[in-house]
Amino acid sequence: LMWLCFLAPAHADSKKEGIDVQDIVFSHIQDAYTWHITEWNGKEIAISLPILVKSEERGWDMFLSHHLHHGQAHHNYYIATEGEHAGKVVEKNSRGEEVRPVDLSLTKNVCGLFLSCGILLFVVLRTAHWYKRHPNQVPSGFTGLMEMIISYIQDGVIKESIGKEEYRPFSSYLLTVFFFILINNLIGIIPVFPGGANITGNIAVTAVLAGCTFIAVNLFATKEYWKEIFWPKAPIYLKLPLPIMPFVEFFGVFTKPFALMIRLFANIMAGHTIILALTCLIFITVSMGLLVNFGMTIVSVLFCAFMNCLELLVACLQAYIFTLLSANYIGLAKVKD
């Protein structure tokens, strides 16, 4: 229902003009230089975010994104509508070429990351402050919920996967990853500002998270782990003269974080896309008559409600799976003789 409230004003005249479903879906799941809130009386209500770019010819430049609305240009900068830089700020240089400047702009996903980090800090500091003030009391309410979640992740996932003697150096990282992914997933489900930022549906974010796990696994791995990589326990004909098994094992070093990255990205992106597509069915069937539109509205609302419940489950499940697999990979790298 909340998705309908935000999409309906923008496409109330869809019966006359029709709607571009692809444009609607991609505009909601992609990053942007503005944070769209809604539309009122045909006017877009959005927050213009600061754009910070560096031109090869003119150096640094900073301005608000509303200068680039509706294909406008500002200081030879504009947002490309097609090509490899579609949706990004590009510059028309003195030779008339379209080039991509150094872009350090504050986009919607970056603002969403700041928001999620602020929420994470608030949750952690509030819980720690309660324990500091009540060291001998049994927690209840929000603090009790946090203790239950932290205890389950640490004792049931981290300690069991890495080992009781080795888990402590990695506990803080894995707990941070779990809550960071969970909060970002939940923010993406909420269509109302300041929610709606598709943070974990951005492959750059999931790549950084997977990269952190990759570093944690390989930087703190034991000698036995690397021995198993380059000289695994396999028949000699699988290692010499062609190093088949060493190649497979070494290839697996990179496929594990790659799988983490794709799994989180694909699951979150798919959920958002399906919900938006189901919502668009209501506006597509406007021109098919009142009866068809009414029937599809009921079907779409029911399916959207089901998908939102499913996406809420996926949001929690993907945070858990990412943490579990990261802990397992770290545990496998801590193998001893």
PLM feature segments, named:
Residues 5-140:
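Perimembrane topogenic segments of multi-pass inner/organellar membrane proteins
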Residues 138, 199-203, 265:
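Short, non-helical or kinked segments that cap or interrupt transmembrane helices
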Residues 13, 18, 134-138, 165-167, ...:
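Alpha-helical transmembrane segments and their immediate interhelical/interface regions
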Residues 171, 175-190, 204, 208, ...:
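Hydrophobic alpha-helical transmembrane segments and adjacent short intramembrane/lumenal linkers
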Residues 1-2:
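Sec-dependent signal peptide recognition
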Residues 122-161, 224-226:
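Hydrophobic transmembrane alpha-helix segments characteristic of membrane transport
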Residues 100-113, 143-144, 148, 155-156, ...:
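Alpha-helical membrane-spanning segments of integral membrane proteins, especially the hydrophobic core
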Residues 192-196:
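Membrane-interface helix termini and inter-helical loops of multi-pass transporters
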